[in-house]
């Protein structure tokens, strides 16, 4: 398992929950095979076929967030990274990406 972790800053804390809900709806649309408006169908198919899990964490006090996108293979991760790196948060107040890193998941334990 491989993960792409992106950090964002500058999101308006007052709109953070709305942004997360919008992302959740977009992910559900992609899962259903109906990419959201503005996303080419090919991009939706890459995400649908390559992403196995998305985890988002936020700090409501300052509007920072992190997004972990999990892929089964390193090849899938590279395809997803290329696609996501070309995207930016769509709205004013949605902040900007400040860092992206790739990792291999070597332990995932629930306790």
Describe each region flagged by the PLM.
Residues 1-66, 72-83, 93-111:
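Short S/T/G/P-rich N-terminal loop/turn motif that feeds into the first structured element of a domain
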Residues 89-90:
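Helix-adjacent hinge/juxtasegments
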């Amino acid at each position: 398992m491989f993960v792409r972790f992106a950090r964002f800053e500058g999101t308006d804390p007052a709109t953070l929950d709305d942004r997360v809900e919008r992302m959740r709806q977009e992910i559900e649309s992609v899962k259903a095979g109906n990419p959201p408006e503005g996303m080419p169908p090919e991009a939706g198919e890459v995400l649908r076929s390559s992403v196995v899990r998305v985890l988002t964490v936020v700090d409501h006090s300052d509007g920072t967030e992190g997004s972990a996108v999990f892929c089964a293979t390193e090849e899938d991760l590279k395809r997803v990274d290329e696609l996501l790196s070309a995207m930016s948060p769509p709205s004013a107040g949605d902040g900007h990406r400040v860092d992206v890193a790739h990792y291999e998941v070597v332990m995932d334990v629930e306790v």
